Amino acid sequence: MAVTNVAELNELVARVKKAQREYANFTQEQVDKIFRAAALAAADARIPLAKMAVEESGMGIVEDKVIKNHFASEYIYNAYKDEKTCGILSEDDTFGTITIAEPIGLICGIVPTTNPTSTAIFKALISLKTRNGIIFSPHPRAKNATNKAADIVLQAAIAAGAPKDIIGWIDQPTVELSNQLMHHPDINLILATGGPGMVKAAYSSGKPAIGVGAGNTPVVVDETADIKRVVASILMSKTFDSGVICASEQSVIVVDAIYDAVRERFASHGGYLLQGK
């Protein structure tokens, strides 16, 4: 059923909550099987998802979004495939403590237009690995790409044994529905990736939230730097996926002793220099 209003959203939350309660009882072996299948499916779809993201959002570069999708699927799988996320993690006889891995419950996943597929893949996979359910609120300008990525992960997870409603999404996202999802009493955690307003809303929701928003990443270049390498690295990073990644360099601070040399190097590589006010 498509989710286009508050009533339909509430029904979706109920379904995903029910699925998560079932999933919370899965063993580590079952979870790892689902995690692997979902990651492989996302990796296999990295190229068509990248094309879909660029076409729908009008932002970024297909080849670079392929890399991001690959990173969000294969790298994340390899990084966490051996991580224990079920049952007893450790016991300390000295202090009489036992550390147990438990799912947090239902997660609200806010996805931006700049990374509509890779962010959805990443959040869906880590939710599956930790036995949580997740509902995505995609950006309106990239909703189809985001929801397609979520559906690919979901279908692979179901085929591997996951409950059928363990991942959900809003089909026609609006600010109202996004806020409704964040403030829903059954949501236990918010993973918010987006602009400053969205991240602030997540932190102001009264729920535990992890937010990632626009940054102002500076680069400091001093006399010890390899100027050729520094300039090439900054330009490569800043132009990756048309510079839409919030962690890419936003400003360069250069000490006086090498300022002219760095400036000339940027200019020789096609960099634009603003002068005056």
Residue map of PLM features:
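N-terminal Rossmann-like NAD(P)+-binding subdomain of aldehyde/semialdehyde dehydrogenases
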Residues: 1-98, 126
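ALDH superfamily catalytic-core signature
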Residues: 3, 199-277
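Predominant activation on well-ordered alpha-helical scaffold segments within soluble catalytic domains
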Residues: 10, 17, 36, 50, ...
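Short, flexible active-site loop motifs that bind/organize anionic cofactors or intermediates
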Residues: 21, 39, 168-171, 220, ...
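Aldehyde/semialdehyde dehydrogenase
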Residues: 25-43, 47, 51-52, 176-189, ...
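Short secondary-structure boundary/hinge segments and terminal tails
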Residues: 71-72, 145, 220, 252
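Rossmann-like NAD(P) dinucleotide-binding subdomain of oxidoreductase/dehydrogenase enzymes
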Residues: 88-229
